[in-house]
Amino acid sequence: MEGEPFDRRLSRADMLRLAALAAGAGVVAGPTAAADAAVAHLTKESGRLQVMDWVGYVNDVPHHATYAAYLKKHPHNKPQFTHMASESDALGRFHAGAHPDLFRPYVGWVKYFAKSGLVQPWNPKLISNFKHLNPFMVKAGQYHGKQYGIPDDWGFDAILYRKDKVHPKARSWGLIFDDRYKGKIAWFDDIGMITVAGLYLKAKNPWNQTSAELDRSVNFLKKKIKLTKLLWAYESDLWQAFRGGDVWVAYAWPNDWVQMKKKFPVVYMHPREKPVAWVGMFMLLKGTPRPHLAHAYVDAWSSKHSGKWLEDNYGYGHANTQARPSSSQLLKALQLANPRAVTLPNAYLDRDIPQRALYAHLWEQVKASA
C-alpha cells in the first residue's frame, strides 16, 4: 500500500533529541521501552480530536462501544463531534472553513474526495484491526492504490413499509411511487432518488444516465413527488412521521427497520431491481494536526466488539468480518455471513456519480415541482 503521508521524517535535530530522550529513559526502562517512549514524546498530539459524523452516531457517552476503546487509551482526549446531514453538507462546511480531523462519507464519494485534495490516505499499519476488515470493502475505499477510506458500517437503501396498511403488487422500488399510497410515502432528500428512479426505469447505468434517461427519470420524479408526505434528511424526522401514522411507506435504512419494528408490523423489502448498498468510509482530512489520534479512533471503531455493538444497536452491518449480531433475524436480513452482500447479485454497491453537480441541480428541480 502506497502512501504514509504523515509518518514523520526525523530531522537531525529530532534525531539528537531522540537520542537524548532514549538515553535518559533507558536508565530506567531498558532500550526498547526507551525508544518507544522517545518516539511517543516526539509524536505527541495536542487538542481534542475533531470528528464530523452523521447525526445518531455521535452519542459520546462512555458505554458507546464504537469508540470506547479509544476513550480507554486516550481518557483525556474525548472526541469533539460536529454533525453532517449528508456528504454535500460536509463539503459545504469544509468550503466554509470547517476542518475536522476525520469524517465519514459513504463509498460513492470516495473517488470524489480523493481527487478533491481535501483528504489524505490512511496508513493501515497504524490500524491493528485493519486485517479483520472485509477485503472487498477495503478495496472499495482505495483510489489509485492508496487507502483513502477505512470501511466500517454498511447497509442498504431499500423500502420500509407497514404490512398492516400496505399491500405491494410486487417486490419493487415501484412501491415508493405507488399512487395508492398518496400522502403516506417518504423519500430520502438526496440525489440518490434520481439513481433509484433510474434503477426502476431500467437506465443502463443509473449513476451515469444519458441525457434522455435523465429526462425520463426527472420527469417521473416530478410527477410522483406529489405522492409524498415527507422528504427526510434526518432519520428522526422519518421516525416521527412513521410513529405518528403519517407515513406507511419509506425509502429507508436498516436502522429505521430496527426502530420501527418495535411498535409496528413492518417489512424491510429487498426490491427486485436490487437495493443500493452503502459502506461508511472514514476519511482523514489533509493537514490534520492529530493523525495518530485519528488512526486510534478509527481502530477502535474497527474492532470486533465495536462491530457487534453497532449491529445490535443500529441494525447495520460492520466491515469487521468477525463481528456478529445477537439477532439471527438481522443476520439473515443483511446477509451478514456473506462477505459480498453489498454487491451483485445481491445489491448494487453505491458508486461515484460523474455528473454529480448536474444530478444535484436536477434534484432541486424535482423538489421545486412539488
Which residue ranges define each predicted feature?
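Conserved C-terminal helix/tail region of periplasmic/extracytoplasmic solute-binding proteins
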Residues: 240, 340-370
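A ligand-binding cleft/hinge motif common to bilobed small-molecule-binding domains
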Residues: 108-114, 243, 248-265
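Extracytoplasmic ligand-binding site segments that recognize negatively charged/polar headgroups
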Residues: 57-63, 104-110, 114-243
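Mature extracytoplasmic/periplasmic domains
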Residues: 280, 285-347
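N-terminal secretory signal peptides
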Residues: 1-10, 14, 23
